[in-house]
Amino acid sequence: ELTFAGVLGGKKFQYTYEDGFCISLDADFVITGEVTPGANKPEGPFGDHLGYYSLAHDFPVMHVHKVYAKKNNAIWPFTVVGRPPQEDTQFGALIHELTGTALKHEIPGLKEINAVDAAGVHPLLLAIGSERYTPYLKEKRPSELLTISNRILGTGQLSLAKFLFITADDSSANEKLSVNDIPGFLRYCLERIDLTRDLHFQTQTSIDTLDYSGSGLNSGSKVVLAAYGEPLRKLCTSVPVSCPGARLVLPGVLAMQMDKFSSYEKAKKEFEALNEKLKNENLSEVALLIACDDAAFVAETASSIRCCFSF
């Protein structure tokens, strides 16, 4: 926070001490207090930046000592949280602007990264890196990209990502890759990903506190989708006849209409039935199936697919 304050203000962080507390000289308001280890109280439920309500959990309590404010024209900042685009949209854009070039130096081999706003910023990362480990081999496969991926998922707020798509810009490719061209970036990755090799799961790891898709509070899984090399498939541009009721979201990406979630037991049976139905079908041009309860919405706009990567 101190580093960010300095970058944001364009000068070193100015402070003083009073009553044993560090006081910012640039802040409009400062609240000082003490936290007693183990003295927790329930917090929540409250609305979060993904548009849902959190559950109640015990968190540390601060006993306020004093509240300081500037004498004149003090501004009390506040924000509104909810489904994107709201709070994280502005914060995300600002952080991208401030840290975009710095991350390339912080993470060796990283060229571009985009924390996608429509997914809630944290859950979905798109990245372009270098692939220099084995230039003497004919086979092109993710290698250095995996090293970069681990560094990304071990760096600050980037560690909150649930899905990380990463590839390398191949100089032989006719198109210029950009993480900001999300449909083009996903198409490039999905044409090249080897689904028997390029899905790298991290299980029983730390995740966002607000993510309830895990096995417990702050505990769950995430996945790296690393794609590099020559195209392995041509992506479909229409819904295959074997997938009636599905909607085409992007080339090679289908939204499959399912019932609204009611229980894990029912969902398990639905997916078993879907697997049985599709296992003998020719889906070679389909790289990604999205199971959802509103396929029409997911296919409606390019940003809708990004929402599917929230949790």
Please place each PLM-identified region on the residue numbering.
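Charged, compositionally biased interaction regions
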Residues: 1-311
